[in-house]
From Swiss-Prot:
InterPro entries (UniProt xref): GAF-like_dom_sf, HrcA, HrcA_C, WH-like_DNA-bd_sf, WH_DNA-bd_sf, WHTH_transcript_rep_HrcA_IDD
Keyword Repeat: no
GO biological process: negative regulation of DNA-templated transcription
Protein name: Heat-inducible transcription repressor HrcA
Record organism: Chloroflexus aurantiacus (strain ATCC 29366 / DSM 635 / J-10-fl)
Gene from which this protein is expressed: hrcA
Transcription keyword on record: yes
Function: Negative regulator of class I heat shock genes (grpE-dnaK-dnaJ and groELS operons). Prevents heat-shock induction of these operons.
Length: 372
């Protein structure tokens, strides 16, 4: 029988994880007793490690006398044993300064976030560009550019603007265009794509059927929203592939089989980061959460992700723009460091977007970043 998970066994599990993360080598009981000066014998520690193995928190590689953590062991560590840490003040200042250099340049924030995450967490990083949580229509304006052509300016909440030309009948006055655009703006006010499609099918406003031209304008808006939603599927940016590939997991130990396994893992890693396959299902979960998400090894639904841990956090301004950022690496990961890095960068990006939109962010379990 494995017995209870006593305080001492929890301490030993924590030390095994700490040692394995540092060395990438299976941990022996003698190592823990000697290095950490434990007040018990190596035989006692060995018995506790055997109990932890029976509980599913450690495993015993066939080629070694030591033990390594399982996914369940890492999960218990993250939820129960890990001490919450923060980046040092010097690191925070350095990171804030880098973002200050591109302040107001939204398109560069994501790339910079990826670079900083990879360098600080010593693993690969991933991020999505900020986008509207759910596209909502705001207004429509029609501008005559020719007697048979008008420019439709479609505005969505979050500052997103789409422009498109459309043919008009000769003789339509600017007042006709203004009136039709105003009616459509009132009809579709704050509508999501699904709601706009419903209103287009009903084709009435205040009980009065829409004219053919007004129906054309509604259909134009619906098509623009549909195209935007399709194009706005999260593109996943990444950085730090060399940081990740420097980990021992990607280096062959000896022999042809080891080399082939290392090459296959390298190929799979590059495919994950290039295509986003395996990561894409995690994005909606992270967007729906207000905190840091940690997915460890076998917890992934995708088989290709079973050797990796992913730490993600949402950033952005609710009701305006939101995105996701995080790190990916082997399950043998420095979880406290990685989590604190993801949490800090997400908070900093949230503050930057809040400043851009002149709103106050609501409290969350993501630690606040100091002002730039």
């Amino acid at each position: 029988m494995s017995g209870p998970l006593t305080e001492r066994r929890q301490m030993i599990l924590k030390l095994v994880i700490q040692e394995f993360v540092d060395t990438a080598t299976p941990v022996a009981s003698e190592t823990l007793v000697r290095k950490y000066r434990l007040p018990v014998s190596s035989a006692t520690v060995r018995n506790d490690m055997a109990a932890l193995e029976e509980l599913g928190f450690l495993t015993h590689p066939h080629t070694s006398g030591g033990r390594i953590p399982t996914d369940a062991g890492y999960r218990f560590f993250v939820e129960n044993l890990m001490e919450r840490t923060t980046l040092s003040p010097a690191e925070q200042r350095m990171i804030r300064h880098q973002f200050y250099q591109v302040r107001g340049e939204l398109d560069q924030w994501v790339q910079l976030a990826c670079a900083v995450l990879a360098r600080t967490a010593h693993n690969a990083s991933v991020a999505t560009a900020p986008r509207a949580e759910q596209l909502r229509f705001k207004s429509l304006e029609l501008i005559a550019i020719h007697e048979t052509m008008a420019l439709a300016v479609i505005v969505f909440h979050g500052g997103i603007v789409k422009q498109q030309t459309l043919p008009i009948e000769p003789g339509r006055t600017p007042e006709d265009l203004r009136r039709a655009a105003g009616l459509v703006s009132d009809l579709l006010a704050d509508a999501t794509l699904s709601r706009a499609e419903e209103l287009a099918a009903i084709a009435t406003f205040n009980g009065v059927p829409l004219s053919e031209f007004e129906r054309t304008l509604v259909d134009l808006v619906v098509r623009a929203m549909s195209v935007f939603e399709e194009q706005a599927q999260e593109q996943i940016y990444s950085d730090g592939i060399l940081e990740m590939l420097s980990q021992p997991e990607f280096l062959p130990a000896s022999g042809r089989d080891d080399a082939e396994r290392a090459i296959e893992r390298l190929r799979r890693t590059l495919e994950i980061l290039k295509s986003g396959r395996g990561l894409s299902p995690l994005i909606p979960q992270a967007l729906a959460s207000g905190g840091v998400q940690v997915i460890i090894g076998g917890e992934h639904s995708e088989d290709t992700m079973r050797d990796y841990s992913v730490i993600l956090a949402r950033y952005g301004v609710e009701g305006a723009l939101v995105g996701v950022l995080g790190v990916i690496g082997p399950t043998r990961m420095a979880y406290p460091r990685s989590i604190s890095t993801v949490r800090y960068i997400a908070s900093l990006m949230t503050n930057l977007l809040a400043d851009l939109y002149h709103v106050n962010t609501r409290p969350s379990d993501i630690e606040p970043a100091a002002e730039l």
